Every structure is written in structure tokens, then in C-alpha cells.
């Protein structure tokens, strides 16, 4: 069976594979982050979101994998075999869990669309030959797309002040909702 754990979230294993393995924090750091940010929601019997559910499952599976690794460590007497098993788990399974945990924590933190846009932008950047791409990789942030970054060396253009507008004589309208109350 070819199961892609990211498909229902609009991403793919291939899309995450563009990020180098050293990009992802350690499983321990990711578990600490998930616990610090989302412990209450993860331990709640209530359904919060598909990302919370996926994160719960990944955390439980990692715990089971560590139980198995401990068992193997205790029961495999051949040190070379034990080292091979530990190396395989850390290299292959560890990376998959680091990717999975990072993806769902990032989606909860930044929003799914932002994370998908980042993965696509990074994928385009990494596949562009170095001579034709910007020196710095895209970064995952919450800054809006409309942020303008000025080039160094140029002085900013002086703007002429705009003429003052006449205020209307009618009373000011109030907004029906404040920005903070919107989700």
C-alpha cells in the first residue's frame, strides 16, 4: 500500500523531501515544542483539528517505537546488530517522525496554507541551479506577502506629502467588529 500521511493536508512526502534532513529539529525538541504549545489540546478528549489528531497519533507511535527500541537494545546481544538497528531507526524512522511532527506543529503554529506555500517555495528554490537562485532559502514566517524589502545602497525615495483631505460633516462610522475578534 502506498500511503502518504500528508495527502489529506494538501502536501506530499515528496514535497517534504525537498527539505534537507538536518532542517528538522530532533524528535525530543519537537515533542517538547508540541507539549509546550499544545499540551492541553492534545490531552483533551475533545476533537480540536485533524492536525491535533495526527500529532497525537505520531506521538503515540513514537512512544511505541521507543519501547521497541529499548526491547531490542536489551534483548539483542550482538553489539554490531544492536548498533545497526539503532542506526536504522534513527536514520530512517527518526527522520520520518521528525518530518511528521514538524509538519503538524508548523501547520498549527503558522497555518496550513502558509506551510504549504513555504514547502512549494523551498522546493522551487532548491531545484533552481545555484547560479540562478537567490543566495538565501525562503523562510517560514508569519510575515505577510506584501512586505517590501528595500535593496541595500539605495536611499529611500522622498515622498511628497499628500494634501489633507477635508473631513466630511457626517458622524464617523464605527466598525461592527474589531480585528482581534475575528478568527
Swiss-Prot record:
- One of this protein's GO BP terms? microtubule-dependent intracellular transport of viral material towards nucleus
User: Where is the segment annotated RNA binding?
Assistant: 177-183
- List, in alphabetical order, the Gene Ontology terms for molecular function in this entry: DNA binding; RNA binding; structural molecule activity
Post-translationally, this protein is described as follows, namely: Phosphorylated by host SRPK1, SRPK2, and maybe protein kinase C or GAPDH. Phosphorylation is critical for pregenomic RNA packaging. Protein kinase C phosphorylation is stimulated by HBx protein and may play a role in transport of the viral genome to the nucleus at the late step during the viral replication cycle.
Q: Which cysteines are joined by disulfide bonds?
A: none
Compartment annotation = Virion; Host cytoplasm
Predominant subcellular localization, coarse grouping: virion
Q: Does the keyword DNA-binding apply?
A: yes
Query: Which segment of this protein is annotated as the motif Bipartite nuclear localization signal?
Result: 158-175
Region 3 X 8 AA repeats of S-P-R-R-R-[PR]-S-Q: what ranges?
155-177
| Pfam families attached to this UniProt entry | Hepatitis_core
Please give an example of a GO cellular component term from this record: host cell
Q: Which ranges does the UniProt record give for the sequence repeats?
A: 155-161, 162-169, 170-177
PTM Phosphoserine: list the residues. 155, 162, 170
Query: Which UniProt keywords are present, listed alphabetically?
Result: Capsid protein, Cytoplasmic inwards viral transport, DNA-binding, Host cytoplasm, Host-virus interaction, Microtubular inwards viral transport, Phosphoprotein, Repeat, RNA-binding, T=4 icosahedral capsid protein, Viral penetration into host nucleus, Virion, Virus entry into host cell
**Out of the domains of life, which is the source?**
Viruses
Task: Fetch the HAMAP family from UniProt.
Answer: HBV_HBEAG
Its assembly, as annotated, is: Homodimerizes, then multimerizes. Interacts with cytosol exposed regions of viral L glycoprotein present in the reticulum-to-Golgi compartment. Interacts with human FLNB. Phosphorylated form interacts with host importin alpha; this interaction depends on the exposure of the NLS, which itself depends upon genome maturation and/or phosphorylation of the capsid protein. Interacts with host NUP153.
Q: What family is this protein classified in?
A: Belongs to the orthohepadnavirus core antigen family.
Outline what the protein does: Self assembles to form an icosahedral capsid. Most capsids appear to be large particles with an icosahedral symmetry of T=4 and consist of 240 copies of capsid protein, though a fraction forms smaller T=3 particles consisting of 180 capsid proteins. Entering capsids are transported along microtubules to the nucleus. Phosphorylation of the capsid is thought to induce exposure of nuclear localization signal in the C-terminal portion of the capsid protein that allows binding to the nuclear pore complex via the importin (karyopherin-) alpha and beta.
The identity of this protein, by name, is Capsid protein
The species this protein belongs to is Hepatitis B virus genotype D subtype ayw (isolate Italy/CI/1992) (HBV-D)
The taxonomy runs:
Viruses, Riboviria, Pararnavirae, Artverviricota, Revtraviricetes
Amino acid at each position: 500500500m502506498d500511503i502518504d500521511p500528508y495527502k489529506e493536508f494538501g502536501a506530499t512526502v515528496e514535497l517534504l523531501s525537498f527539505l534537507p534532513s538536518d532542517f528538522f529539529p530532533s524528535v525530543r525538541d519537537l515533542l517538547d515544542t508540541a507539549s509546550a504549545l499544545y499540551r492541553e489540546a492534545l490531552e483533551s478528549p475533545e476533537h480540536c483539528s485533524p492536525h491535533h489528531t495526527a500529532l497525537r497519533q505520531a506521538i503515540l507511535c513514537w512512544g511505541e517505537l521507543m519501547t521497541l527500541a529499548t526491547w531490542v537494545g536489551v534483548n539483542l546481544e550482538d553489539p554490531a546488530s544492536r548498533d545497526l538497528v539503532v542506526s536504522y531507526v534513527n536514520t530512517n524512522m527518526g527522520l520520518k517522525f521528525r518530518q511528521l511532527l514538524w509538519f503538524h506543529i508548523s501547520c498549527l503554529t503558522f497555518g496550513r496554507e502558509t506551510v504549504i506555500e513555504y514547502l512549494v517555495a523551498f522546493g522551487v528554490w532548491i531545484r533552481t541551479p545555484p547560479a540562478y537562485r537567490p543566495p538565501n532559502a525562503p523562510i517560514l514566517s508569519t510575515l505577510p506577502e506584501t512586505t517590501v524589502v528595500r535593496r541595500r545602497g539605495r536611499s529611500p525615495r522622498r515622498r511628497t506629502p499628500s494634501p489633507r483631505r477635508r473631513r466630511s460633516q457626517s458622524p464617523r462610522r464605527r466598525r461592527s467588529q474589531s480585528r482581534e475578534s475575528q478568527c
